[in-house]
Amino acid sequence: MPIRIPDQLPASDVLRTENIFVMSETRAASQEIRPLRVLILNLMPKKIETETQFLRLLSNSPLQVNVELLRIDNRPSKNTPTEHLDTFYRQFEMVKGKNFDGLIITGAPLGLVQFEDVIYWDHLKTIMEWAKDHVTSTLYVCWAAQAGLKLLYDLPKKTRKEKLSGVYHHQIHNPFHPILRGFDDTFLAPHSRYADFSPHFLEEHTDLDILATSDVAGVYLATTKDKRNVFVTGHPEYDSHTLHNEYIRDLGEGMEPAIPVNYYPNNNPDNPPIASWRSHGHLLFLNWLNYCVYQQTPYDLDHFSEDAFTKDD
């Protein structure tokens, strides 16, 4: 089944050229099944690029998904046209009275900024608290995973000395967990972060199910027992050239970034990178939608409550 997004959203044309089924709002209205309602809080600077990446992954499901885009505040963006934000993005005041099946909170380039120094930190905390009573399952990606762990477990910010950048091997730890169904025993996924997610630290200070780790990158995937909070510390949504663009950006800013690990053929930035994580990203989002959202959410979102959730895997 397709995703349902506004006809004029730039991602619509991009996804259609990739032969991805995008349903118009008119056609979707004639469907007799209840579509899933997913809200994306986009914290990345290049919002059009990021929304397209996440919509691509959400589209690979037999479930119909209605997507709404949320911005953190109304400050002008340096990287996204104001017209785009005004047309396609909601303010929190416009959605806080609704319930959603799923919420995705994207990463943000704030790895070296303390939480209390993030200009929208208080607003982000408000949204995360709101999600506890209005969202079936929340997916926290990269920096948002660190922010979510701070809110839910009061974990201090842990920062690596050097930025983690590249594509890393990961191992799964519970092949029978629903979100890991169909995963290979080892898989590749990209990371681009300063945040440190030590398996030992999370095991000691949380009750999370730690589902996938990397010897180098640490914890990659973890969930709460009820699957209502899912933490992904990498960037499975990244396009093949996203790490490259970040590397070139950092070079242009006079930094001395390390070449992203296991990314360029022969470790040579002159060679076009190969996306070795694409199938993993699609399977991860498919499983999240199916097992953490669809099979957990109440049929009637107007009667959202803890008691409405199924406890079966």
From Swiss-Prot:
It holds the Pfam family HTS. Keywords: Acyltransferase, Amino-acid biosynthesis, Cytoplasm, Methionine biosynthesis, Transferase. GO terms for cellular component: cytoplasm. It comes from the Bacteria. Pathway: Amino-acid biosynthesis; L-methionine biosynthesis via de novo pathway; O-succinyl-L-homoserine from L-homoserine: step 1/1. It catalyses: L-homoserine + succinyl-CoA = O-succinyl-L-homoserine + CoA. Substrate binds at residues 163, 192, 249. It is found in: Cytoplasm. Its EC number is 2.3.1.46. GO terms for molecular function: homoserine O-acetyltransferase activity; homoserine O-succinyltransferase activity. Its main location: cytoplasm. The record marks 192 as: Important for substrate specificity. SUPFAM superfamilies: Class I glutamine amidotransferase-like. The record marks 111 as: Important for acyl-CoA specificity. The active site is at 142 (acyl-thioester intermediate), 235 (proton acceptor), 237. One of its GO terms (biological process) is L-methionine biosynthetic process from homoserine via O-succinyl-L-homoserine and cystathionine. Belongs to the MetA family. NCBIfam families: metA. Transfers a succinyl group from succinyl-CoA to L-homoserine, forming succinyl-L-homoserine. This is Homoserine O-succinyltransferase. It comes from Vibrio parahaemolyticus serotype O3:K6 (strain RIMD 2210633). The lineage of its organism: Bacteria, Pseudomonadati, Pseudomonadota, Gammaproteobacteria, Vibrionales.
